A protein has these predicted regions:
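Solvent-exposed helix/loop surface patches that form functional interfaces
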Residues: 131-167
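Solvent-exposed loop/turn segments connecting transmembrane beta-strands
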Residues: 73-77, 98-103, 202-203
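Bacterial Sec signal peptide processing site at the extreme N-terminus
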Residues: 27-51
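A short, Trp-centered hydrophobic/proline-enriched beta-strand micro-motif
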Residues: 55-75
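Extended lipid/amphipathic-ligand handling interfaces
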Residues: 82-85, 105-108, 183-187
């Protein structure tokens, strides 16, 4: 028996609503329209500018960002607020939203060990932060890569493909199976820092809009 055109099953309606909500959520996350970024520049001067920017950022042992995240995987979508603080090699990421959908804190020590504490007080530890987050959230989030990518840097232990503009700002990074696209920057203390970025891999899309950067000083 064929189904009449224009008639939908309840499941179809629910799926459509989920998809619509996902698209609206991702659209709202990126906010207004940013000015288009310039074309990629393959000149030695552009490469040197990227390396100079990298050296300046790597020299900072403390920084902080506040951002909104949106992750889409299949028909699943969640959003979260992120407060990421770094001081003397220790990363503290406070998330409101996921981790049992109640939020929690992820701490990365200088030796690479990860500790995740949910809002309900559950504690999880692992040497691999990506595997730890995937086990607790059930989603693939490349935390170890984002330590670098969120600042527009390359992970030093992975092969890569990179596009930069004439000023040395990253436009697109391909690394560890992820594509990271940068859509907007702002100047913070003389450095171009990402404002909006999109990470994609095998049907997973993670978007970030950074509302605040602090470079150096006390990030608490």
């Amino acid at each position: 028996m064929s189904r009449a055109a224009g008639m939908r099953k309840p499941g179809d309606l629910a799926g459509g609503a989920r998809l619509a909500g996902l698209l609206v959520g991702l659209g709202l996350l990126l906010g207004g329209c940013a000015a288009p970024l310039p074309e990629a520049d393959t000149s030695p001067a552009a490469e040197a500018a990227f390396e100079a920017r990298t050296a300046q950022l790597e020299a900072l042992d403390s920084w902080r960002l506040v951002a909104r995240l949106g992750l889409a995987s299949g028909e699943e979508y969640w959003s979260a607020q992120l407060n990421w603080r770094v001081q003397e090699g220790q990363h503290v990421l406070d998330l409101s939203g996921p981790m049992g959908r109640g939020g929690g804190r992820l701490t990365l020590s200088e030796n690479g060990r990860a500790l995740l504490v949910t809002r309900s007080g559950e504690r999880f530890q692992a040497q691999d932060p990506d595997a730890l987050v995937a086990r607790v959230l059930g989603e693939s989030i490349p935390v170890s890569g984002m330590v670098y990518w969120v600042r527009g840097l390359l992970h030093p232990e992975a092969s890569y493909q990179l596009d930069v503009d004439a000023d040395g700002r990253p436009l697109e990074i391909h690394q560890s199976g992820w594509t990271i696209e940068y859509n907007e920057f702002e100047e913070i203390d003389g450095l171009a820092m990402p404002v909006t970025m999109v990470l994609e891999r095998e049907g997973v899309e993670l978007r970030a809009r950074i509302g605040r950067w602090q470079l150096g000083g006390d990030p608490s």
